[in-house]
Design a protein with these regions (language model features):
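Residue-level signature of outer-membrane beta-barrel architecture
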Residues: 2-3, 46, 58-60, 112-116, ...
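Surface-exposed extracellular loop regions of Gram-negative outer-membrane beta-barrel proteins
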Residues: 3-51, 73-95, 136, 177-198, ...
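Transmembrane beta-barrel strands of outer-membrane/channel proteins
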Residues: 13-17, 35, 56, 67-73, ...
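C-terminal beta-signal and adjacent terminal beta-strands/loops
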Residues: 19, 76, 171, 180-199, ...
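Extracellular loop and loop/strand-boundary signature of outer-membrane beta-barrel proteins
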Residues: 33-42, 56, 93-99, 107, ...
Length: 286
């Protein structure tokens, strides 16, 4: 549903209902990023999502610039999560270590774009929260986080990005992209005990996802070379030279804890997947 105030201004509202039969479980405390997909069935109900949104849209200078803002709220039913101490690796009875709960997500999205000229780009920012409430199977079972709201693995308070491109001439085009995101929620141990000479971390069952991985950010650049079109060919090609994560940020994919062999204390071990990644790509189109 939309209402046009004038040729450059409009207000839009929307409602969506979606059903998902595959459920994702993530664990950032494993030595490597761990994602488990669980299908709906006798013990796992399909996930239902109701989304409400209202937005304001504005064009400037005959569409050379556009501004988009939107407020949204999502209500999610039957969202699963794993119980405290669950083993997600090689578990053939995953339904025995998960509980059904409900979740909510809400926030504000902002997007400003420059659409014309040799220099184009956009700035985007999202301020949001994503939380879950998961009670036990019975009234006597405490549930997750003592049956209180807690952050989901997808909760990113701040999500900021800038994209810019410059058409230098008919052959060369330069692009850059910067991304900053609040670190993913995680569980850190609050204590430890010794068992058969090994320090075992202890987690607070009432503080699910109370900690966070370090903030995620990176800067990418690329240059695109488009040679003059060969009139004898029916297709046009281009070369793309890029560098992903230019300044080599070691973004954390997960965080695990192990015993230091010198101090015999548990220490955090960060797993990072990508550092600086140069690339050369050749694209063609007919």
């Amino acid at each position: 549903m939309s209402y046009r105030y004038d040729d450059n201004t409009s207000i839009k509202a929307s409602y969506n209902r979606m059903v998902q039969y595959l459920h994702l479980l993530s664990n950032t405390a494993s030595p490597t990023p761990l994602d488990i997909w669980a299908p709906s069935g006798k013990y796992i109900k399909p996930q239902l999502l109701d989304q409400y949104a209202i937005g304001y849209f504005k064009r400037f200078k005959e569409g050379s610039y556009t501004l988009e803002t939107e407020v949204f709220y999502k209500d999610i039913q039957n969202r699963i999560d794993y119980i405290n101490g669950a083993n997600l690796v090689a578990n053939n009875e995953i339904e025995t270590v998960i509980l059904n709960g409900k979740a909510r997500a809400y926030g504000l999205e902002f997007l400003f774009k420059k659409n014309e000229g040799n220099f184009q780009g956009w700035i985007a920012y999202t301020l949001s929260r994503s939380e879950q409430l998961t009670k036990g199977r019975t009234e006597s079972e405490p549930g997750i986080n003592n049956s209180s709201w807690y952050s989901t693995p997808f909760d990113k308070t701040h999500d900021f990005s800038i994209n810019a491109s410059y058409q230098f001439n008919e052959k060369w085009k330069f692009n850059s992209n910067f991304v900053f995101q609040t670190g993913q929620p995680a569980n850190y141990p609050v204590n430890q005990y010794e068992y058969q000479g090994i320090n075992v971390p202890v987690y607070d069952a009432n503080r699910r996802n109370a900690n966070r991985l370090p903030a995620y950010h990176r800067f990418d650049i690329a240059a695109t070379l488009t040679p003059e079109k060969n009139k004898t060919r029916t297709w046009q090609g281009e070369w793309v030279f890029g560098i992903y994560n230019l300044y080599g940020r070691q973004n954390a994919a997960s965080l695990a804890f192990r015993q230091n062999q010198e101090t015999f204390r548990n220490e955090a071990v960060q797993t990072s997947i990508f550092g600086v990644v140069p690339s050369v790509t050749y694209n063609f189109k007919f």
